[in-house]
Structures are given as structure tokens and as C-alpha cells.
């Protein structure tokens, strides 16, 4: 009896595993596959009928035996039959899953779109409108950006030199030369007013030094929700820590046997004087921004008589957020951001983000790789075809994002996310695919990648833990070996924000044709008349 049941289980499992629908031929046509499937199904049907007749004959010949419920052999036989049958079923399920993956692979449109609706909306973007918009961007860039950069660099140099003269060289922070980052310095800025982001590095006076505690270091105690951040500890350096003349005012008639008369003893200051968080030795972003804002105000007061324009603070919560207004009405916006350089690298701990995104609480400082990103974009651009479309794609999407944000309000999506998507695409696609004739396809790729990232709530930082980047530029080893950081982690924790951001993106695509059409140049008597909206 047990043998017959086992044979029945094996027969059913074999029929499932060898079903013709589970083994399609990849290179066969649909007509050939249909005929072959029908033939195999008839063959299996005949085989099953023969086996069924054979099993019925065996069952009819069996003589009834007295039931022995306590028989250990009978239970063992049923158990083994069930185990064999379950094993075959598990194998069959895995084969069906693998067959489904091979038979019906998803295309890019299926992966990137929601219900297949993204691709048709992208096709609604007229090629002529895109080209006209890009011509306008090129015109604006070539005629304004370089003049604005030249002005900003000269003004920032003068302002920082005045700031150094205001500060006490023995007590205040030492300010270095600024570093230009962002869209203006990467030549893809499109919307007005033109905004220039400047990193202003500073360091503590002697004998103090900075120690860095990164989130990815082995001995780090940075919490998981502070990935991409670090703490900056202010410590005293040098060999004078055990000398009393450096920690107290001993009077002019006291002579230190460890130092000569030319050494000026310094009185130890409190953590607040060193811009640290209260009762700690870790540098405070709030204290730094307060110090920087006061210093910039004093510095501008010293040189304001030299200039024929007005300078005001745009945002009192963001130190160095300046607005320059000329008598003609033209406005130039500056973001002078106090930062701390990570040792001898091009990575900087920033006090705040110019985009206004939420900053982590003290004493955690977010780490910016904007200089590396600028260098990476510049290096990749040299390998692309002449008049490549990568910056035009970035300009189009950031323009649409800004215009949509003015209609529906701000969401979690920022221009930095869009630029990160572009860098991922530049690292993953051949250089020849970025020619100007491929602009529509690359624009579709960028929007599709961004849409998928928003749906999955996952967009990895392009510099952290990315082996493709280390092949092109020298990123600090501790950063290149770190685990990737998700830039959209906030969407995982906030369902309402995720829904708002997705709605913003869908509305942006819906309004894209109208927005681009409204802001394309109009030609009159051979002259390009540019609107004020860009």
C-alpha cells in the first residue's frame, strides 16, 4: 500500500516538474512553441492514463489487511512519502519562480513607471521645445554666469579679508580661502536669481586642534540615523598641556623655565569661547553660525563704503546667506557657508545646507563631498562627445522641479537628488550615449531613475561606498569602503512626506510640456527675447 502511494506522489511531482509550460524554448517562435506544447501535452496525457490504469489494477489486486494503527513501519512509510512529495513541490516552486523571471523580464518602462504611465508622459515632451529651452539655457549661461562668478569671487575675497582683520588672530577662528561649489560653478544653473555657494573653511587658533569622529569609523558612536555625519572634537595640541603658564595668568613678574620670554602665554578659554556645545568639547554648529554671522556683519561694515550696492542677510537662520541688490534692480545671491575641512581631503563638514534642508542636531556635522562631485562632473564631461546633453538634462529637470515647487510647495526632493541621479547615470552609461541626438532618451532615463528612487525610497550617495568613483578620482579610503548612504532615508520614516513627494513628481511630469513651452525663447526680428521667469 505504501509503495503505491509513494509511486503516486512521485508520478504527480514528475508530471508537474515536466509540464511543458515550464520549459519553453527561448529561441522558438510562438507558432512553433504552440505546436510543440500541444504535442508534449498529448504525450504526457497518454502516459498519465497508462500509469493510472496500472495503479488501479494494483489497487484492485491488493487484499485487505488488518489495520494496525500503532504499526511503526506504516507511520514511517506515510512520513517518507509525504517528505518526498513536499521536496518535489518545493523544487517545482523554485523552478516556476526562475522560469517566470526568465520568460517575462521587466523592461525599463515597467521598472521605472507606475502602471506603465511614465513613458507616455515623457513622450509628450516635444523635441523642438526641448531644443529651444536648451538654447535659452546656453544663452543665459554664456552671457551671465561668467560675469556673476567674476563679481562674486572678487567680492568674497574682499569680504573675507575684511573678516580676518576684524577677528582676533590669537583668540578667534582662523578663516581660509573660499571654495566655489554648486550649479553656478558647475555651469548648469538655469533659474534666476543666480545663486553662488561658497565654502569658507575655518580652523581653531593655536594650540588647539580638531579630531574627527566619522559615522563609518571603527570606533564610532554616531547613531545609525546620523549616517553621513560626524562629530568634531576640539582638543589642545602640543607639549604645553602640563605647563601652568598656558592655563592661568601668572603675572608679568613670573618667569616660566620651560618657555623663553618671546613666548606669549595663552589663558585657557571656556568651551563657549571655542564655539563648542555646552559642557562638551565638541564643536557646535549653532555657535559657529552665530560667530560667523556676527563676523560677516562687522566685516561688511568696514568695506561697505567701497561698493555701490546693498547687502542684506536673506535668512537669519543661515549664516552667510547674503543678497546683493544693485541700483538697477539686479540681484545676486550668495551662500557663504562656514565649514571644517576633513584633514587634508576635499571633504568638508558643513554647518548647514544651502538648499535649506533640515540639518542634524548638534554636535553632528553633515559631511559634504561637493568638491569631489564638481571634479567628477568635470572629469566625466571631458570624456563625453562635444555638445553633450548631460547638463541640458539636468537643467531641464531642475527647472521643472523648481517651477512645480512654486505651485505645490516644497517636498523632500531637492536639486541635489537630481544631480546625484545624473552622476549615477554618467557612471553607468557609455560616453557615446550622451550625444546631443540622444537628449530625449537620456532625459527619459534621468526621470525614470528618479521616479524609481522615489518609489523605492532609496537613492545612494554617489561618493560613499561606490567603487566606480574610486576608479576616476581619489576619494578617502574610509569613505570608499563605507556602506552606501541612502539620501532618501527620510521617506522611509515619514509616509506622508513620501506621498507628497511622489505627488509632486507626478504633477511635475504632467505640467512639464506647458512649463517648458511657456519659458522657451521667442524670436522677433532675429532677436531672442527671453522671459523673466528663468
Curated annotation (Swiss-Prot):
Xref: InterPro entries: ITPRIP-like, Mab-21_HhH/H2TH-like, MAB21L/cGLR
Coiled coil: 25-63
Keywords attached to this entry: Cell membrane, Coiled coil, Glycoprotein, Membrane, Nucleus, Signal, Transmembrane, Transmembrane helix
Membrane topology term: Single-pass type I membrane protein
Domain of life per record: Eukaryota
Signal peptide extent: 1-15
Subcellular location field: Cell membrane; Nucleus outer membrane
GO cellular component term, pick one: plasma membrane
UniProt topological domain (Cytoplasmic) ranges: 92-534
Residues in the Extracellular compartment per record: 16-74
Membrane-spanning parts: 75-91
Glycosylation sites: 27
Task of the protein: Enhances Ca(2+)-mediated inhibition of inositol 1,4,5-triphosphate receptor (ITPR) Ca(2+) release.
PANTHER family tied to this protein: CELL FATE DETERMINING PROTEIN MAB21-RELATED (PTHR10656), INOSITOL 1,4,5-TRISPHOSPHATE RECEPTOR-INTERACTING PROTEIN (PTHR10656:SF8)
Protein name: Inositol 1,4,5-trisphosphate receptor-interacting protein
Organism of derivation: Takifugu rubripes (Japanese pufferfish)
Gene designation per UniProt: itprip
